[in-house]
Every structure is written in structure tokens, then in C-alpha cells.
């Protein structure tokens, strides 16, 4: 998240899913060994940020995300992309970094999409409570992550369904885009700081909902 509260830049599109300037919010994670390992690559930086990313993903058994985070393209599911003419399976390629079941909130039904590495995208049309129940069953004794985007995160926060929240605060100003907390400030209270880790490129906050 930027210092002015944005988690995506303006003018999000199929070609630019996190908006103008949005990639700057994630530049800290790309050199990390943990990020490379999730994408089947070797090497990378080992530092405090790497430790936090490893810990965040170590006990995940399922992830929830919105339609836009899966692959944009509002409306009914298209058969392919304008550029490649292939079936549209989202932004994540043939071997996504999740390696566990993912539940995608959408208004448009679709059969589950099984890809390499253990990732299966399941499409949920009956709301956040249903997505959470399905994700909990799939995760078993492991944790469930609400990955985003901002709209989905706001729904879970407003409903009081978030036990812990992690924010990676990047020292930049975007000036415009999509804010995480728009419209949920009055509903969000009782947060406690669990940990704070500052690095030159990002500060990692973990909150618990009391």
C-alpha cells in the first residue's frame, strides 16, 4: 500500500491490471527468494522481507480473491484474449504461485480451473460467506488468505470476517487509484498491532482484530 492509502493505481485495465504506477507497490517483493520459489525459480534476496513473505505463505491452505484479481474482463467469461486468441485463464499463467485451492468471487458461473502446481481456481457466485466456508473446508487446519483486490478485502473487513491483516507499506505516493479502506473506516475498530518490521523499501505491519 502507498503512503496515501492506495493499493492500485488509476486506470486499471486488462493490459494494466494494477493501474498506472501500481507496479511500484510491489517492486520490493520481486527480488526475494521466497517470491522466486513460489514461481518455480531459484535464487533471490534473503532478508527480513523474505522472512515475512515465507511466514505469510507457510501455513496457507486456500486463498480468496475477486474477479478482477483473477483476470479482469468484467461481464461474462470470454473465450480468449484479444491478443492471443487462447482460452482466458486469468493473469496467472499455466503454473500460478498459489499451489492450493483459490476461490474467485464472481457474478458469472464457471467450472473449476485446475492448473499446474496444485492450484485450482473455483468460481463462487453466492457471496463472501460462501467463499469463506468453501475455502475453510479446502484449507483444513491451515489458514485462509483474502488476497484482494481492494473491493473484496473491504467486504470482508466490513463484515468482520478478518482475524488478522497484513499491510506492506511502501514509501511512495500514488495520488490516485483504488484505496483499501474507502467506506469501511467506521466499521473497522479494535485492531491491535501484532508486529512492525521496517526495511528501506517497505514496512510490514501485522494487525489482529480484537
Where do the PLM segments sit?
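Enzymes that bind and transform nitrogen-containing heteroaromatic metabolites
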Residues: 1-210
